[in-house]
Amino acid sequence: MDDIDSLILIGVLIALTAFFVASEFAIVRVRRSRIDQLITEGNKRAILARRVITDLDEYLSASQLGITLTSIGLGVLGEPAFERLLHPLFEPLGLPDSVSHAVSFAVAYGLITFLHVVVGELAPKTVAIQKAEQLTLLIAGPLRLFYLLLFPFIWILNGSARLLCGMFGLKPASEHDGSHSEEELRMLLSESLKNGEINPSEYKYVNKIFEFDNRIAKEIMIPRKEMAAVSTEMTMAEMLEVMLKEKYTRWPVTDGDKDSVLGLVNTKHLFSDLLFMTEEERMKMTIHPYVRPVIEVIETIPVHDLLIKMQRERIHMAILSDEYGGTSGLVTTEDILEEIVGEIRDEFDEDEQPLIQKLGDGHYVMDGKVRIDQVNSLLGASIQEDVDTIGGLILKENIDIEAGESIRIGSYTIKVLKMDGRLIKQIDIKEEAGNTTGITAHHKLPLPEPVMLNSATLSEK
């Protein structure tokens, strides 16, 4: 074989290497959903491409076999051919033949390696990653033909690899396992956010959906003490007065005590009927015909399961009970939805204070019922979560704490701003530089002057 034929063959081998490398990366990178869409649009080449990516492991093996064969061919033919072409160039230098041969060998080896890596591997890989769809449609036919021609060898090689793995007690890994753990998905989302593929709102919503499955109803409930309810012991006029004042759509109806919830009443139905009643009918009106069933579940039910139950039964309110059968609080579909999209306010919530208000770096005013995990996420802290809320944590540290007093946990000073009886309504939390001892201390401080809170909020419930 003369030098010209050798150079042509080297060019063919480099081109084949580039083909197999591009094939390997393209069929891994291409989105199956996009190929399926092309099939529905009538693209015939997409049918063959779908067949290739369905048996991805087999075609990856074919690509790897092709890369190996062409690389070996380049090693066998490329270096000697380039060495023969380069050797005469060093003869005029008067170098000993052994030195001239060694130098020409080194240059030839470096040149063939450069062409193989750059032209045969790196460039095709870059193109395949950026143009995966177009390349997959282009190479699917030739790659399938190569696979069919060398199927016996590919089958033997795959079988031998499985046997070798089995000897060491290992299972062969699937090269196209498309599943990802939750942590991997979170990392992918984070990278997509950094690269501008998704916006911060999308990132926030998807992360909240991951957290959603870890929530229990107790963590998002309206506590028993804050439940607004009407009682059958009230007169109809008293009930209507309470309903008009608070403006809720659905109300729990009790039998005189919040531990005895009879059901719920929807004010839309109630007030719609009131509009068309005579004065005499209004005087005789009672709440009982308007009481509808309400969901009653244990407070530890997962929020996801509760949502499914509410959807199935088409009831938008659930009463939660503790392990002793007493009412611990209630949850509405709005409370559940707010776990994903953040706080939802309607035209009647104008005066409602956000749960968390930012005053500065590491300095917040927040409601006492904000969850510990929210505080940790907000501050980048690691406060122990053996209680549910920041208010509960403060009472655990100092059961006799009063408004105006503070405790110090690690590098954070937490001051109680408002209390309702023994319920902590609002606190001020601030990171203090230079205190990272982790020791909890208690201090009596004067009540702060009223402060104007800025509009930077983290509206979560």
Swiss-Prot record:
InterPro entries: CBS_dom, CBS_dom_sf, CNNM, FAD-bd_PCMH-like_sf, FAD-bd_PCMH_sub2, Ion_transp-like_CBS, Transptr-assoc_dom, UPF0053_domain. GO terms for molecular function: flavin adenine dinucleotide binding. Residues 1-202 form the CNNM transmembrane domain. It comes from Bacillus subtilis (strain 168). This is UPF0053 protein YhdT. SMART domains: CorC_HlyC. The keyword Cell membrane applies. Keywords: CBS domain, Cell membrane, Membrane, Repeat, Transmembrane, Transmembrane helix.
